[in-house]
Design a protein with these regions (language model features):
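Binuclear metal-dependent phosphoesterase catalytic core
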Residues: 2-5, 73-76, 112, 117-156
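Glycine-rich loops and low-complexity Gly/Arg-rich segments
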Residues: 31-36, 55-58, 77-81, 106-109, ...
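Structured loop/turn residues at beta-strand edges in well-structured enzyme cores
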Residues: 25, 93, 144
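N-terminal active-site segment of His-dependent metallophosphoesterases
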Residues: 1-51, 59-70, 131-133
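Active-site neighborhood of phospho(di)ester-bond hydrolases with catalytic His/Asp-centered motifs
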Residues: 8-10, 29-35, 52-57, 82-85, ...
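Short, structured coil segments at secondary-structure junctions
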Residues: 47-49, 94, 114
């Protein structure tokens, strides 16, 4: 079985902790749901793995290149992925996996109406109602199945 590891982050706000960098090593793809707040951090992430990212409400003055916009749609592991900063802007009818940020509060769930996997990885920098966190999704490349989706608490 061939798998792909997607490491999911959001709301790093210009700081990539050593614990976060260590967790990201070995990722096949890094998905960032906005509020990167640092072009140099974005470049650092790109040195670890390919990055699929969207802009957050604090990113508009930064230039991360032409592929980073308010909404990121990409295909990976046979699945349609959608990444936006605000959960309210997700269109769950048009994706299999939906990633959001902004609240700094982690969760992972399946939408009961569409069956879409929805994740907010929380924030590794400024968590709210939780500890610093990120997400991880493992997909089967042959079947397009999500094998696991979890929130990882950093620093434990």
């Amino acid at each position: 079985m061939s798998t792909t590891r997607y490491d999911i982050i959001s709301d790093t706000h210009g700081f990539l902790s050593p614990e976060l960098i260590e967790q990201l090593r070995g990722a096949d793809v890094i998905v960032h749901a906005g509020d990167i707040c640092s072009p140099s951090d974005f470049q650092h992430l790109e040195m670890i793995a390919p990055v699929q990212a969207c802009l957050g409400n604090n990113d508009w003055s930064n230039d991360y290149g032409p592929t980073v916009k308010a909404r990121k749609i990409f295909y990976g592991s046979g699945l349609r992925w959608q990444v936006v900063h605000f959960r309210e802007r997700l269109n769950l009818l048009k994706c299999d996996v939906a990633i959001c940020g902004h609240t700094h509060t982690p969760f992972v769930t399946r939408d009961e109406w569409t069956g879409t996997l929805v994740m907010n990885p929380g924030s590794p920098t400024y968590p709210r109602r939780s500890k610093p966190s990120m997400g991880r999704i493992i997909c089967d490349e042959d079947t397009g199945e999500v094998l696991s989706a979890e929130i990882i608490t950093l620093g434990e």
